Amino acid sequence: MLAVLLCFGLSFGLGLRPQTSNLVDSKGKKQGPWVLRFENGSKKSEGLFKDGRQVGRWVYFTEQGKLKSEMEFLVDTSFTNAKFYHPNGKVAGEGMYKNKKRHGRWFFYDTDGNLISEERYLKGLLNDTIKQFHFNGKLYEKWVYNQGLREGLWEQYFDSGTLKARGVYKNNNMQGHIAFFHSNGRLALSGFYENDLRHGTFTYYHEDGKVRVVLRYIHGELHPADRSKVQIPETKEYVPEEYLKEQFRQKGYSDY
């Protein structure tokens, strides 16, 4: 009889084992260790709360159990250090948040760990000089942002390091003279933009420096008299290529 009572008491005691995670205090604030899970039961995130605020290191996972990101919530501040990962475990991006908005310098990497872009943010908006890189590490492109708008000099480079293109932005629009170069350094194209539209004369050159064709534009439209001339691909050469960053975004590494 005593043995039965002891077993019953032991089982009852185990059933009343105090909860050690996902706690909420009398004021409704989350406290201590927390673990969140996906519907399939796999771990989604884990970390600490203090008075309802995330503190210290938090880890986030995909539904397949792979590490997705790490956040370091600095105690008693509005700053958070962040690091995101590719599915292969390589770092995809890293930087800092202030009040849950990107702030300061951010770095983005490809799946092999090569740096593909360096960006600067102010209160969640691109600000200052932004750089992108070729896979060989050389500078591919750089331009300047002012509170989320492109403003100032824009340049693009071949993977050899020589200049490929140069133009100027004003209030987020291409404005004024633009020039493209062949890989041998000779001028490939010279023209003008007005409020992000081709306007005026665009001169194309062969690699030996000889003029290939001259085309005239009026507020983005090719002059009727020039439509019968040699066909030149109608591309927005000046638009900065954001393919690599877009790939990063499409993989799901969005802000928390």
What are the roles of these predicted feature ranges?
Residues 14-256:
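Glycine/tyrosine- and acidic-biased, solvent-exposed loop/turn segments at the edges of beta-strands
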